[in-house]
Regions:
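Membrane-proximal, non-transmembrane interface segments of integral membrane proteins
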Residues: 1-58
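Soluble C-terminal extramembrane regulatory/interaction domains of multi-pass membrane proteins
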Residues: 43-59, 63-144
């Protein structure tokens, strides 16, 4: 059973499972940052969540990208979740401005990295398309 050409249900199921797990990490991050009771931090986490979900959508649209994105959907999100939990617990008790600045810098790095990975996956898909078009045009010229 094939959906999009070259993509089978096994691949789409793998992506669905990976995205489900990644969503759990995002949910845990969102729950944890609420403990910090800082609306700016909540908004900042939401911005990162949007960047992460953009990467999820890219992988869902082309499940072949899962291999290239797996580290982001698992390892990096797990680290982001763990860092958020530890930060929120510390910040709720201490209001440490340096911890807050460090955490915001981490979110900036994460958001940039996730957005870059999404762009790279999309541009790889574009490169594949450009190659296909070029090969087809060359064949058409040779036939003419």
């Amino acid at each position: 059973d094939k959906g999009a050409e070259g993509i089978d249900t096994f691949q789409t199921d793998r992506v669905a499972r990976a995205v489900d797990e990644a969503e759990k990490h995002l949910s845990a991050m969102r729950d944890a940052i609420l403990r910090a009771q800082d609306r700016q931090l909540e908004g900042r986490v939401d911005r990162f969540i949007a960047a992460a979900r953009a990467l999820f959508r890219t992988v869902e649209e082309d499940p072949r990208d899962l291999t290239a994105a797996r580290k982001y959907l698992s390892v990096y999100l797990m680290g982001a979740r763990d860092s958020t939990v530890k930060f929120a617990d510390l910040y709720a008790r201490s209001r440490d401005p340096q911890a807050r600045a460090d955490y915001l810098a981490l979110l900036d790095d994460l958001e940039t990295t996730f957005a870059d990975r999404s762009r790279r996956l999309l541009s790889d898909n574009r490169s594949d398309l450009d190659v296909e078009i070029s090969v087809l045009r060359d064949r058409l010229k040779a036939e003419a």
